[in-house]
Structure formats: C-alpha cells, structure tokens
Amino acid sequence: ALVVEMGGEPVVVAEEDRALYHAGLSHGANFIAGITVQTMRILTEAGISDPALYARPLLEAALDRALTEGTAGISGPAARGDAGTIAAHARCLSARDALAGERNTYADMTRALTRLLREARLLDERAATAVEAALLDPGA
C-alpha cells in the first residue's frame, strides 16, 4: 500500500528475497539522504548560505542519470580518472576538522565509484590506480 501511495508499482517479492529487497531500497534511499546532508555541510563550511539551492539541480541530475544510464551515467573526477582533483578534494576536506566524517565518506565513495567504473570497463587500470593513490597521499 505504501508503494502505491508514493506513486510506485507494487511487486511481489519472494519471502527469501524480502530482506535483500529492503536492503537495496534502504541502501539507496538512506545513503542518498546521508550524502546529501554531508554535501550541505561541506557547502556550508565553504561559505554557501543556501546550499540546497546549489546542490539540488546537480543532485537531481546525477540521480536521474544513474537511474536511466546506470554506471555509464557516473560523471565527475573519479569517472574522468582525474587524480589531481581527487587529491585537491581530499586535501581540503582533511584540512577542516569539522568535515572529518565527510572526508572519510568521500574516500570510501570514491573507491566504490572507481570499483564500479573499473568493473564496467569505463575506467582503465592506470587511471583507477592514480585515483586511489590520490586518496592515500593527497599531497602528492
């Protein structure tokens, strides 16, 4: 009933798959919310007074691309293999004690994106290795 109320299509999920189904939806909805909150904290720390105004269009576009294009819809420095930008992001996040949690999430999510892109053959080994190295030593 809740799915229909939210505009979704009901689906029958086998009993043995219900926890996995719920884990998948929780993974998406909860982590999008958490990353969005962290995004707002980073923007606020950068002096942006209304972070939602700046974040909303980009976040909505990224979600739409992910839903329609899958892994191919991932963009940004990890997808480009831009180790220099990744290192700059890691440095500025590390420099702010208030953003320690965001720094950890950034590193974890960059590694996860790199793994997805590598598996989909959208990022070559050399670029992926450079991105991961930039997270380990952002001063390099």
What does each model-found stretch correspond to?
Residues A1-T68, A95:
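Internal alpha-helical scaffold of NAD(P)-dependent oxidoreductase catalytic cores
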Residues A19-A23, N30, S75, A79-A83, ...:
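Solvent-exposed, non-transmembrane amphipathic alpha-helical segments
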Residues E60-A127:
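Interdomain hinge/lid region at the active-site interface
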Residues L122-A140:
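Short, basic/aromatic-enriched C-terminal tail that caps enzymatic domains
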